[in-house]
Design a protein with these regions (language model features):
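Flexible, solvent-exposed loop/hinge segments and secondary-structure transition points
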Residues: 1-158
Length: 158
């Protein structure tokens, strides 16, 4: 048997707060979804003024990042993104009843080398969503200190 880390509400709240604080700093209205390792939401928070479509899009991004263990923008990154036309996963975005997100804003949450969830952001442009997502990952690392290692970067692929 192997011991694993389970992402809980306390960590999800901390991450969402960090993402929203960063969104306020850069003046963008974000929706944040923190999902568990199965892609199920632990927390969804939509800032006042954020789009009404944000919660579903953020959840889709968190679901994809957690389930496929990679940042969502990597699916369409040239030249070898697997979801690009002619590549092995072209059309994957239509799977899971259209919930598979292949654009920027979803990041796996990796603790001690294990994917424990995903974070999805919707509301900004790609750079803004990424900035807020990385801020959330950084906040989780700061929370754990030296007890656990969180992968804090935009390009994550396990």
């Amino acid at each position: 048997m192997r011991q694993t880390f389970k992402l809980e509400r306390a960590e999800a709240r901390l991450m969402a707060a960090a993402a929203i604080t960063k969104a306020e700093e850069i003046k963008v209205f974000e929706t944040v979804c923190i999902a568990d390792d199965g892609g199920h939401p632990i927390l969804i928070e939509r800032m006042d003024g954020a789009r009404i479509t944000g919660p579903q899009i953020a959840w889709n991004k968190a679901f994809t990042a957690a389930g496929h263990k990679r940042s969502t923008h990597l699916f369409n990154q040239t030249p070898n993104g697997p979801a690009l036309p002619g590549n092995e996963a072209f059309g994957i975005q239509w799977s899971f009843e259209g919930r598979f997100a292949v654009f920027v804003g979803g990041f796996p949450i990796v603790v001690d080398g294990e994917v424990v969830g995903g974070i999805g952001l919707s509301g900004g442009n790609g750079e803004q969503d990424t900035t807020c997502g990385v801020a959330a990952l950084k906040a989780l690392q700061e929370y754990f200190g030296s007890k656990h290692r969180v992968l804090v970067q935009a390009d994550i692929k396990l």
